């Protein structure tokens, strides 16, 4: 198993983010929202992260949230389909609620309709 998180697993360019947002395939929970593409033409998934200053004013808080999401992706990327994902943090979470954020991320990424995720058009 490969647990690295190299550049090939990241969405880096504005066009990559725009193409994912153009599909308008979004699901959200209390803390997170995940947008996904139909496919990326590669043999592995890629992820992009959006954590705005409205969510958390301090950079160390935003970095912590991104680190939690990246770590979850790094450990689970082999189980995900070859799609592009953009994860947007809707509400701030910290060490106390990081477990809830990981659980929500799993529900949103694996796309189980029985999880009660809200689908947005």
UniProtKB/Swiss-Prot annotation:
One of its GO terms (molecular function) is 3'-tRNA processing endoribonuclease activity. It is an enzyme of class 3 (hydrolase). Keywords: Endonuclease, Hydrolase, Nuclease, RNA-binding, tRNA processing. GO terms for cellular component: ribonuclease P complex. SUPFAM superfamilies: Ribosomal protein S5 domain 2-like (SSF54211). GO terms for biological process: tRNA 5'-leader removal. Its EC number is 3.1.26.5. It catalyses: Endonucleolytic cleavage of RNA, removing 5'-extranucleotides from tRNA precursor. PROSITE patterns: RIBONUCLEASE_P. It comes from the Bacteria. NCBIfam families: rnpA. RNaseP catalyzes the removal of the 5'-leader sequence from pre-tRNA to produce the mature 5'-terminus. It can also cleave other RNA substrates such as 4.5S RNA. The protein component plays an auxiliary but essential role in vivo by binding to the 5'-leader sequence and broadening the substrate specificity of the ribozyme. Belongs to the RnpA family. Consists of a catalytic RNA component (M1 or rnpB) and a protein subunit. This is Ribonuclease P protein component. It comes from Neisseria meningitidis serogroup A / serotype 4A (strain DSM 15465 / Z2491). The gene is rnpA.
């Amino acid at each position: 198993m490969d647990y690295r998180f190299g550049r090939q697993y990241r969405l880096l360019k504005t066009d990559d983010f725009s193409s994912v947002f153009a599909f308008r395939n979004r699901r959200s929970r209390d803390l997170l929202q995940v947008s996904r593409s139909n496919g990326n033409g590669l043999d592995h998934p890629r992820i992009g992260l959006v954590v705005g200053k409205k969510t958390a004013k301090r950079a160390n808080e935003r970095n912590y949230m991104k680190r939690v999401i990246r770590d979850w992706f790094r450990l689970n990327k082999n189980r995900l389909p070859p799609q592009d994902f953009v994860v947007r943090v809707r509400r701030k979470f910290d060490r106390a609620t990081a477990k809830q954020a990981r659980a929500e991320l799993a529900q949103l990424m694996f796309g189980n309709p029985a999880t009660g995720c809200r689908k947005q058009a």
